[in-house]
Amino acid sequence: MELLYIDPGTGSMLFSVLIGATATLYFLARAVVLKLKFILGGKKGAADKSAHTYVIYNEDKRYQNVFRPVLDAFERHGTEVSYFTSFKDDEAFSAGYKFVKSEYIGEGNAAFARLNLLSADIVLATTPGLGVYQWKRSKNVKHYAHILHSPGDATMYRLFGIDYFDSVLLSGEYQKDDVRYLEKTRGIKEKDLPVVGCTYLDFYKERIEKIPAEEKHEFTVLLSPSWGPSGILAKYGERLLDPLLATGWNIIVRPHPQSKISEAEMLERLSKKYEGNGNLIWDYETDNIYSMKKADIMISDFSGIIYDYTFLCDKPVMYVNADIELALYDAYDVPGQKPWQVNAVKDFGIELKEEQFPTIKEVIQNASDSEELARRRAKAKQTAWQFEGQSGEKVYEFMAEKERQLNFTGSSEQ
């Protein structure tokens, strides 16, 4: 008996068809029930008990800290919010919340099946691709809001990543223009684009300040590559690690989380080669703040951790090969300019060239910090991380005001 093979694209399409059919039957049945309540009760049926006012969805353990300041704000205001998560050990379960109703809804297709049948006024998520892949708009959700999980450009998502949201919550005013350009050229409706700050940076700022200083500090270099063939670890490997370890300094390598999935063979090879080297630490922890706190300087490429380190630690950064291939990203459709985040790194960072690797100790020693570099870091921070320390409250205020607008409009139409 031959086994049938369904390629991933066809499988995704079939899943979408199945979800669409299920959703249709669900909404038809629900409509019939409400209609019967109306007829038999002589008035409008009671509100659907499964409906939610506010829903927040977290797709992965990496993003739970994006939502913690928002959940804390809902708790402070005594406003109930449904928090759906695809991370079984989400910290929200043990946070002692009274007004945050946390629920694990599974991962992947199981989570999307739940989300696609949702009834809610407002859904907030950091997951892109609404209306593009498995995640479809529910007819019973009034407003979809996307919150950025980086202070970088809003166009640095894969194609159409944020096109079909009703609002995108930004970390800085600078992100608006490119979003508006794509809306106009693609003929899609304008979204609400409130600037709310950066929630996870606010969260980490509090935590990193509480980490005690080392009793005996040794000079430490943090190597933080992005993933993919252009990332510095994949591209240079031993050519960069060998001279770094020859310095005798402590070297922390923090691979991108995706590298463990897409570049596992490379990581295993390098780990085995340098096994037993006491100066080399491989950091796979969820939180990056402990390595950043220890580091005196960071070496990276185009990874978003550059901004975490720059904005939270205010220490010098060296970049190698900071350019990124934009063809798969929304930013590719914005002509005439590179994304702000690419130019910003080159402005406040120090370039490290491949031919400098053999003398990297001297290069780093001579790449001292300066008042000018500190000024440029501060400028980038002010641009990309507005409302520092206020983001959770800002997101709550936006959602509460949007819910009032939706209900006012709905009641006016009845």
Model-derived segments and spans:
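Short, strongly hydrophobic alpha-helical membrane anchors
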Residues: 1-9
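C-terminal amphipathic helix plus adjacent low-complexity
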Residues: 42, 346, 352-414
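Active-site and donor-binding regions of nucleotide-sugar-utilizing enzymes
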Residues: 55-205
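Conserved catalytic-core segment of nucleotide-activated headgroup transferases in glycan assembly
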Residues: 62-78, 199-270, 354-357, 368, ...
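Short acidic-hydrophobic, aromatic-tinged amphipathic segments that line or gate anion-handling sites
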Residues: 101-108, 280-284, 347-357
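A donor-sugar binding/catalytic signature common to diverse glycosyltransferases
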Residues: 142, 146, 285-332
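Nucleotide-activated donor-binding/catalytic signature segment of Leloir-type glycosyltransferases, i.e.
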Residues: 267-284
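Nucleotide-sugar donor-binding patch of glycosyltransferase catalytic domains
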Residues: 311-366
